[in-house]
């Protein structure tokens, strides 16, 4: 007797398998890009289809690779992640944005959400939480780093300094 096939986390028993969530990673640091891609490709339901090193490349790559969720750093050469998020939102490409950054500041969170991001996490987020955040965003939800969300409530909508703006 042959054992049943292993369960796929993206399919319910007896249903048709779903296509993996197609991801783009935009970060100017090649090591970070590569590490994130390797990590996320370990997930059965996630597939990194594009990697870019600047905000200038994001919209074209999303169009070319039919991306479901774009992971964007804030500080990149050319267009930053916040400007790029607004451009993706305006282009109506059906791509959701998750900001993944070292800039864990409430003002950046506020600006990212205003630009149309569906999520905002800092780069020290545990890997399993990053993968789950991508799934939630793809399903139409929002994900915000809980510490930043709390700070935003306490400090108000725009605690960025003049230099950060």
Language-model features: locations:
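Conserved sequence signature across two-component system core domains
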Residues: 26-27, 52, 70
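Short hydrophobic/Thr-rich beta-strand motif most characteristic of the beta2 strand and flanking loop
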Residues: 45-53, 61
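Acidic catalytic/metal-coordinating carboxylates
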Residues: 53-57, 77-83
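Short, conserved "switch-loop" micro-motifs in signal-transduction and mechanochemical regulators
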Residues: 103-104
């Amino acid at each position: 007797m042959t054992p049943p096939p292993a369960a796929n986390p993206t399919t319910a028993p007896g249903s048709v398998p779903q296509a993996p969530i197609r991801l783009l990673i935009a970060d100017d640091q090649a090591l970070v890009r590569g590490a994130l891609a390797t990590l996320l490709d370990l997930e059965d339901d996630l597939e990194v289809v594009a990697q870019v090193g600047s905000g200038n490349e994001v919209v074209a790559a999303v169009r070319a690779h039919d991306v479901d969720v774009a992971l964007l750093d804030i500080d990149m050469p050319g267009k930053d992640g916040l400007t790029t998020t607004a451009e993706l939102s305006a282009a109506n490409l059906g791509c959701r944005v998750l900001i993944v950054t070292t800039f864990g500041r409430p003002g950046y969170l506020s600006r990212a959400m205003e630009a149309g991001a569906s999520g905002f996490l800092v780069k020290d987020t545990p890997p399993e939480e990053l993968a789950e955040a991508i799934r939630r965003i793809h399903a139409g939800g929002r994900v915000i780093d809980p510490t930043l969300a709390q700070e935003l409530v306490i400090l108000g909508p725009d605690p960025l300094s003049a230099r950060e703006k």
